[in-house]
Amino acid sequence: MYSPVESEQGFNFKPELPTSSAYYRLLKKLRRQVGHAIRDFKMIEDGDKVMVCVSGGKDSYTLLDILLQFKRIAPINFDIVAVNLDQKQPGFPEDVLPRYMEENNIPYYILEKDTYTITKRLTPEGKTYCAVCSRLRRGSLYGFAQEIGATKVALGHHRDDIIATFFLNLFHGGSLKAMPPKLLSSDKKNILIRPLAYVEEKDIIKYADLRKFPIIPCNLCGSQENLQRAMLNEMLREWDKQYPKRLHSIFGALQNVSPSQLADRDLFDFEILDSQRELDFKDPEEMKKRLDIVNLSFAAD
């Protein structure tokens, strides 16, 4: 049994593990989905050092928790280190993540960079901070991954994030793209992985609640969520209520692309189709006879 450790904010840094059957069913489901994602996309290999980006939100806590469980039972050896970027947002509880990591014996780093001030300066008035903030955050974390010799950078995006990004690009960006489960960073120095790619957000919410993670709010900066993404997230939630299989089908479509059925000339060579056409009659004379017969039949009609 774990002994609870309380903070001044009321957080429980080392809660007792749930014992309900609902918890174990959910845990089994999450392990299966994360395991399949890791296997399908070869996310983690023997000898890897996986840097898990932890913000203090439900997604990153769940990701870290499941990966730590895999580390204990996996047939391969790999290391996990948690990294949080303290962006110096006003009101950010700086003691929460260090306490949680230490109480649970998790190797971690706290990277301190005042990106909040830079974000405020670079963001036009009336706009949300999210775009600039995420760009600065990515740059800081990816650079730090190189410093500590991480071979993989694990991010907490889940299935619903991937689908929302797909529609965001479709509706507002004029492109068919989402968040890939595995990606080479633009500077080609980091491999990014999303082990929660198959996991639904509603299951993460349930799991985080059952595990009683010390959740840190994501809106401490005072900025509101990007309006377009907020509307898409609401649309997806409504779809999930009314048509439970729809999101599953959409995510399946992202794994079942037919380039020849789209209109991207860089993705498919449409010019080669003429040379690939197979005709039933290779003898020109035979072809002419058949065409004459067809023409006569039209004339008779």
Swiss-Prot record:
One of its GO terms (cellular component) is cytoplasm. GO terms for molecular function: 4 iron, 4 sulfur cluster binding; ATP binding; magnesium ion binding; sulfurtransferase activity; tRNA binding. [4Fe-4S] cluster binds at C130, C133, C221. Its EC number is 2.8.1.-. It is found in: Cytoplasm. A motif (PP-loop motif) lies at residues 55-60. Its main location: cytoplasm. It is an enzyme of class 2 (transferase). It catalyses: cytidine(32) in tRNA + S-sulfanyl-L-cysteinyl-[cysteine desulfurase] + AH2 + ATP = 2-thiocytidine(32) in tRNA + L-cysteinyl-[cysteine desulfurase] + A + AMP + diphosphate + H(+). Pathway: tRNA modification. One of its GO terms (biological process) is tRNA thio-modification. Binds 1 [4Fe-4S] cluster per subunit. The cluster is chelated by three Cys residues, the fourth Fe has a free coordination site that may bind a sulfur atom transferred from the persulfide of IscS. It comes from the Bacteria. Keywords: 4Fe-4S, ATP-binding, Cytoplasm, Iron, Iron-sulfur, Magnesium, Metal-binding, Nucleotide-binding, RNA-binding, Transferase, tRNA processing, tRNA-binding. The keyword Amino-acid biosynthesis does not apply. Homodimer. NCBIfam families: PRK10696.1 (NF007972). The thiolation reaction likely consists of two steps: a first activation step by ATP to form an adenylated intermediate of the target base of tRNA, and a second nucleophilic substitution step of the sulfur (S) atom supplied by the hydrosulfide attached to the Fe-S cluster. Belongs to the TtcA family. PANTHER family: AMINOTRAN_5 DOMAIN-CONTAINING PROTEIN, SULFURTRANSFERASE-RELATED. Catalyzes the ATP-dependent 2-thiolation of cytidine in position 32 of tRNA, to form 2-thiocytidine (s(2)C32). The sulfur atoms are provided by the cysteine/cysteine desulfurase (IscS) system. This is tRNA-cytidine(32) 2-sulfurtransferase.
